[in-house]
Amino acid sequence: GFFALIPKIISSPIFKTLLSAVGSALSSSGGQE
C-alpha cells in the first residue's frame, strides 16, 4: 500500500532536497529562529 512507500520517499535524495528548500524558505521568512 501507500504507507509502504513512505520510508522510500523519506530516504530519497529528492525528499531531502525539498526539506532543505522548505527549511531555508521558512528560516529566511523568519518563521523559525
Swiss-Prot record:
Transmembrane domains' residue ranges: none
GO terms of molecular function: toxin activity
Superkingdom, taxonomy of origin: Eukaryota
Disulfide bridge positions per record: none
InterPro entries assigned to the protein according to its UniProt record, in alphabetical order: Pardaxin
Keyword list, A-Z: Ion transport, Membrane, Secreted, Target cell membrane, Target membrane, Toxin, Transmembrane, Transport
Location of this chain's protein in the cell: Secreted; Target cell membrane
GO process terms (BP): monoatomic ion transport
Keyword Chloroplast listed: no
Cellular component terms (Gene Ontology): extracellular region; membrane; other organism cell membrane
Domain description: Consists of a C-terminal hydrophilic region and a predominantly hydrophobic remainder.
Role noted for this protein: Exhibits unusual shark repellent and surfactant properties. Forms voltage-dependent, ion-permeable channels in membranes. At high concentration causes cell membrane lysis.
Family: Belongs to the pardaxin family.
Name of the protein in question: Pardaxin P-2
Organism: Pardachirus pavoninus
